[in-house]
C-alpha cells in the first residue's frame, strides 16, 4: 500500500482534522485550568527546590507534560466541547496517564475495546467522531475509520509523524527499517504499519544479535523464531538485512537508540566497506527532543545527594519506565508510582511497580531525620499530579515527625 498517497488523501478529507477547533490561547487556558500547579511553578522559580521542615525536594529540571502530550490532551477535550452530543470514540488511551484517561471517560468519550490485542470497531458508526491518540494509529485503523465515514480527530504527536516519514523514506529507497522499540507498544505498531520491510529490536542485546547474524554468526531458524512477532510478514534475514535504516519509538532511551544506530553503521561498514556504506545504511535522527530533555534532566538529578527518588507516570508509559531505569542504574532507592494515592500517609508505605514486576508495597517508605527526595515525572503526567505527590510527602514527613516527638 502507498501509505504516503493514503495520508495525502486523508488529510484533504473534510472529515479529517489535525489542527483542533480552538485558538492556541483558549486551548492553553483550558489546559492550565485543568492541570497546572502554582506550587510546581513556585518550585521551578526556586531552582527546582522545595525545603519544608525535614524534607528537601529536588525536582528534575525537565519533567511532566511535553508539547505533544499537551496538544493531544487539549485537542481531545476541545473535541467534546465542539461535538457536545455526538458519539466520540478514542482508539486507545490518549496518553499513558490514568487520571487523564479517566477524565475523558467522565466526558463520555468511549474507548475502543480490544481482545488479545485486536481492537473491535464494530460499534463505531458512520458520522461518529473518533480521536487518534498521541501515539498515532495504524494505517489499517485510519483506513477503516475513513471508509466508514467517521470524523477523524488526529492528535498524533508531530515527532511520531516524523518517524513515520523516516520509515516511509526507507521503504521508498528499498531499505529495511530497524525500529528500536517495544513490539506491542501503540506507537511502534503504528510506525511499523507505515514501514515496508521492518524488524523491531527491543534493546542493544537484540540489536547485537541481529548484527552478529549480518556478519555470518547466527542461525537462520533461531533468528526467525526469535523475531517471528517482531518483523514484517515474510521477513527474510538473508535478503532483508542487506540495506538498513534505523528509526525508533520516540520514548525509548536516547543513549541506547544512538548506540544501536552506531552498531548497525559499524556492522554495515565492516561487511561492505566505506565505499559502499551509503548503499547499505541510512543515518537517522528520530529522537524526540522532549524525551531527550527529560532523560538528560534525570541524569543530572541522580547526581544530586538523594536518599530516595519518586518517578511518577503510568505503569505502561515507556518514557517513564526509562526514567526509572536511569535511577536504578545509579543505585538510588527509587519508586515508580502512577498516582499520588500510592503513598500511604498513615502507614508510611508506598505501593510501587518495580521494573518488570508486579505492584509491591514498601514499608517504612520515608526514613527518619532529614531527607532528600528527588522527583521526576513522565511526559504524560500533569503538574497537578506532581503537586499532589509532593503534598503527600510533606504530610507524611510532618506526621512521622510528630510521631517521633
From Swiss-Prot:
EC top class named in words: oxidoreductase
Residues at which [4Fe-4S] cluster binds: 66, 157, 288
Pathway: Isoprenoid biosynthesis; dimethylallyl diphosphate biosynthesis; dimethylallyl diphosphate from (2E)-4-hydroxy-3-methylbutenyl diphosphate: step 1/1; Isoprenoid biosynthesis; isopentenyl diphosphate biosynthesis via DXP pathway; isopentenyl diphosphate from 1-deoxy-D-xylulose 5-phosphate: step 6/6
Pfam families: LYTB (PF02401)
GO terms assigned for molecular function: 4 iron, 4 sulfur cluster binding; 4-hydroxy-3-methylbut-2-enyl diphosphate reductase activity; metal ion binding
Residue sites binding isopentenyl diphosphate per the record: 96, 185, 317-319, 380
Co-factor binding comment: Binds 1 [4Fe-4S] cluster per subunit.
Keyword Membrane: no
Active site annotation, chain numbering: 187
Keyword line: 4Fe-4S, Iron, Iron-sulfur, Isoprene biosynthesis, Metal-binding, Oxidoreductase
Domain of life: Bacteria
GO biological process: dimethylallyl diphosphate biosynthetic process; isopentenyl diphosphate biosynthetic process, methylerythritol 4-phosphate pathway; terpenoid biosynthetic process
Keyword Transferase tagged: no
Amino acids binding (2E)-4-hydroxy-3-methylbut-2-enyl diphosphate: 96, 185, 250, 317-319, 380
Annotated binding of dimethylallyl diphosphate, by residue: 96, 185, 317-319, 380
Names of the cofactor(s): [4Fe-4S] cluster
PANTHER family: 4-HYDROXY-3-METHYLBUT-2-ENYL DIPHOSPHATE REDUCTASE, CHLOROPLASTIC
Descriptive protein name: 4-hydroxy-3-methylbut-2-enyl diphosphate reductase
Organism this protein belongs to: Prochlorococcus marinus (strain SARG / CCMP1375 / SS120)
Organism classification: Bacteria, Bacillati, Cyanobacteriota, Cyanophyceae, Synechococcales
Gene name of the encoded protein: ispH
Amino acid at each position: 500500500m502507498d501509505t504516503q498517497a493514503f495520508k495525502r488523501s486523508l488529510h484533504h478529507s473534510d472529515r479529517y482534522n489535525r489542527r483542533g477547533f480552538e485558538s492556541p490561547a483558549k486551548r492553553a487556558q483550558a489546559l492550565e485550568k485543568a492541570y497546572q500547579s502554582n506550587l510546581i511553578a513556585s518550585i521551578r522559580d526556586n531552582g527546582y527546590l522545595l525545603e519544608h521542615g525535614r524534607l528537601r525536594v529536588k525536582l528534575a529540571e525537565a519533567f511532566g507534560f511535553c508539547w505533544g502530550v499537551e496538544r493531544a490532551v487539549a485537542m481531545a477535550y476541545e473535541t467534546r466541547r465542539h461535538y457536545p452530543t455526538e458519539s466520540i470514540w478514542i482508539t486507545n488511551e490518549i496518553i499513558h496517564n490514568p487520571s487523564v484517561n479517566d477524565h475523558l471517560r467522565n466526558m463520555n468519550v468511549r474507548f475502543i475495546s480490544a481482545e488479545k490485542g485486536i481492537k473491535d470497531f464494530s460499534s463505531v458508526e458512520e458520522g461518529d467522531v473518533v480521536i487518534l491518540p498521541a501515539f498515532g494509529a495504524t494505517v489499517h485503523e485510519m483506513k477503516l475509520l475513513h471508509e466508514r465515514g467517521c470524523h477523524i480527530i488526529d492528535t498524533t504527536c508531530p515527532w511520531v509523524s516524523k518517524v513515520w516519514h523516516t520509515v516511509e523514506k526507507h521503504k521508498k529507497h528499498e531499505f529495511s527499517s530497524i525500529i528500536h522499540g517495544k513490539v506491542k507498544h501503540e506507537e511502534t505498531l503504528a510506525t511499523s504499519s507505515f514501514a515496508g520491510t521492518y524488524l523491531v529490536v527491543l534493546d542493544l542485546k537484540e540489536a547485537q544479535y541481529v548484527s552478529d547474524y549480518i556478519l555470518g554468526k547466527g542461525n537462520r531458524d533461531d533468528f526467525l523464531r526469535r523475531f517471528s512477532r517482531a518483523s514484517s510478514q515474510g521477513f527474510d534475514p538473508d535478503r532483508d538485512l542487506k540495506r538498513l535504516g534505523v528509526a525508533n519509538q520516540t520514548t525509548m532511551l536516547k543513549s541506547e537508540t544512538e548506540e544501536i544506530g552506531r552498531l548497525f553503521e559499524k556492522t554495515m561498514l565492516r561487511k561492505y566497506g566505506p565505499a559502499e556504506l551509503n548503499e547499505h545504511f541510512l543515518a537517522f535522527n528520530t529522537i524526540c527532543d522532549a524525551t531527550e530533555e527529560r532523560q538528560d534532566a534525570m541524569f543530572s538529578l541522580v547526581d544530586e545527594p538523594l536518599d530516595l527518588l519518586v518517578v511518577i507516570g503510568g505503569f505502561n508509559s515507556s518514557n517513564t519506565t526509562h526514567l526509572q531505569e536511569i535511577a536504578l542504574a545509579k543505585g538510588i532507592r527509587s519508586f515508580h508510582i502512577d498516582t499520588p494515592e500510592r503513598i500511604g500517609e498513615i502507614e508510611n508505605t508506598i505501593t510501587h511497580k518495580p521494573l518488570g514486576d508486579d505492584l509491591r508495597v514498601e514499608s517504612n517508605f520515608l526514613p527518619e531525620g532529614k531527607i532528600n527526595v528527588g522527583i521526576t515525572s513522565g511526559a504524560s503526567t500533569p503538574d497537578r499530579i506532581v503537586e499532589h505527590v509532593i503534598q503527600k510527602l510533606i504530610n507524611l514527613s510532618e506526621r512521622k515527625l510528630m510521631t517521633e516527638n
